[in-house]
């Protein structure tokens, strides 16, 4: 599929004895119109990368009501199962995934699939790596200010102190957090300072067209999901005092929940897949 773009990042860490490869995707916004052919092409691209781990950083669903469409959900579950046959898959939740409390039921069931891990303020670790997934609350995204709320983010981190303090020092640590827009703020950086890498999505690459994406080297976008123009932290790689943030451009740039007319413009934007190689000591 010509419209798939593999974005490569090479990092390094003394905590790893060998190189590891991550595939990082997000913002699939799966709905009634999502093509199974598109999902198959994405699977083939992931398979070709030979990842050790696969990360999906939120908005797997466009609207939770899709879970009532048994035929479409069966196809999605089958696709996730096929990814689990490639490598372990870790999913964090985004604002489109968790509109109602009952929306968690679908994601809880996904944990029954072999090699699928939904990290809802939870963690996973093996001999090489520690992974956590944070779920930002509804009032983080939707509030009277109509912008993302730093206090709600800090409260989430404080309430999940076991995911931000006394983490295994010798393991490479990755956090999955759907929205990156406040992850470079000083108080947030201090809370997350034990991590090496934070993976995010949500920003849809700031809706920067592909040609401008190659020219403009900063992390600003044209517009953010909370309707800010020229918002920061919308794309690319960001270095903070302690960790690196990598933001995926997203599988879908314009979802059907915006408008059906706008969603037809998706063909103008690439399907973004991040391939991240972390070089270890050899």
Task: Name every feature range the model reports, one short phrase each.
Residues 24-26, 53-59, 88-95, 117-121, ...:
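Active-site neighborhood of phospho(di)ester-bond hydrolases with catalytic His/Asp-centered motifs
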Residues 113-114, 127-177, 183-190, 258-270:
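Binuclear metal-dependent hydrolase catalytic cores centered on His/Asp/Glu-rich metal-binding motifs
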Residues 24-39, 61-72, 98-102, 139-151, ...:
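Acidic/histidine-rich helix-loop elements
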Residues 180-272:
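Conserved beta-sheet core of the metallophosphoesterase superfamily
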Residues 34-126:
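Core catalytic region of metal-dependent phosphoesterases/phosphodiesterases
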Residues 49, 80-86, 167-169, 188-194, ...:
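Short, conserved loop/helix-junction motifs that constitute active-site signature segments
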Residues 1-33:
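Acidic, histidine-bearing metal-coordination/catalytic regions of metal-dependent phosphoesterases
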Residues 12-23, 123-136, 168-174, 239-245, ...:
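Beta-strand-turn-beta hairpins that frame and shape the catalytic cleft
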